[in-house]
């Protein structure tokens, strides 16, 4: 089992990042890969959780230990797998998640990808009162704004990887078309919009 990895960030995709440590490149699934954009080719520390399956060993990474703690609590709930938990952690407002669980707000919880009524009820049952700390969200600094829509395309691709439907994301794309921002900021803004419905 791993607690964290310290190495050089060598690659960012819509679903994962690659960190090289001791000559090996580790694929690490993260909530918002583009939040690491300012750290490409730099040494960084990523907190890890390893999932071992019959067909694969997967690493899930987090900016902070608090993010990791939220993820671990989420995957302890029956019906929530690691990818669904990552999609929930990706939402910047984890205060909203904690409040929804503590206030039994099923409708709010059902806004997350792949969370139905039954799973939302199970989240409330299993996690109510269990969040002592709230994660700070992404720790990455903003990178300089890029021209064109490449950043928006990357953000949409990352949201698809988190489990959001293409039909939902058409509205997001239309809303942000013609704007100039980073993929990280597009993702944060889009997640807030998606959670509001």
UniProtKB/Swiss-Prot annotation:
Gene3D superfamilies: 5' to 3' exonuclease, C-terminal subdomain (1.10.150.20), DNA helicase RuvA subunit, C-terminal domain (1.10.8.10), Nucleic acid-binding proteins (2.40.50.140). Pfam families: HHH_5 (PF14520), RuvA_C (PF07499), RuvA_N (PF01330). Residues 64-142 are annotated as: Domain II. Keywords: Cytoplasm, DNA damage, DNA recombination, DNA repair, DNA-binding. GO terms for cellular component: cytoplasm; Holliday junction helicase complex; Holliday junction resolvase complex. Residues 142-146 are annotated as: Flexible linker. The keyword DNA repair applies. InterPro entries: DNA_helicase_Holl-junc_RuvA_I, Hlx-hairpin-Hlx_DNA-bd_motif, NA-bd_OB-fold, RuvA, RuvA_2-like, RuvA_C, RuvA_C_sf. It comes from the Bacteria. Residues 147-197 are annotated as: Domain III. Residues 1-63 are annotated as: Domain I. One of its GO terms (molecular function) is four-way junction DNA binding. One of its GO terms (biological process) is DNA repair. Its main location: cytoplasm. It is found in: Cytoplasm. Belongs to the RuvA family. Homotetramer. Forms an RuvA(8)-RuvB(12)-Holliday junction (HJ) complex. HJ DNA is sandwiched between 2 RuvA tetramers; dsDNA enters through RuvA and exits via RuvB. An RuvB hexamer assembles on each DNA strand where it exits the tetramer. Each RuvB hexamer is contacted by two RuvA subunits (via domain III) on 2 adjacent RuvB subunits; this complex drives branch migration. In the full resolvosome a probable DNA-RuvA(4)-RuvB(12)-RuvC(2) complex forms which resolves the HJ. The RuvA-RuvB-RuvC complex processes Holliday junction (HJ) DNA during genetic recombination and DNA repair, while the RuvA-RuvB complex plays an important role in the rescue of blocked DNA replication forks via replication fork reversal (RFR). RuvA specifically binds to HJ cruciform DNA, conferring on it an open structure. The RuvB hexamer acts as an ATP-dependent pump, pulling dsDNA into and through the RuvAB complex. HJ branch migration allows RuvC to scan DNA until it finds its consensus sequence, where it cleaves and resolves the cruciform DNA. Has three domains with a flexible linker between the domains II and III and assumes an 'L' shape. Domain III is highly mobile and contacts RuvB. This is Holliday junction branch migration complex subunit RuvA. It comes from Streptococcus uberis (strain ATCC BAA-854 / 0140J).
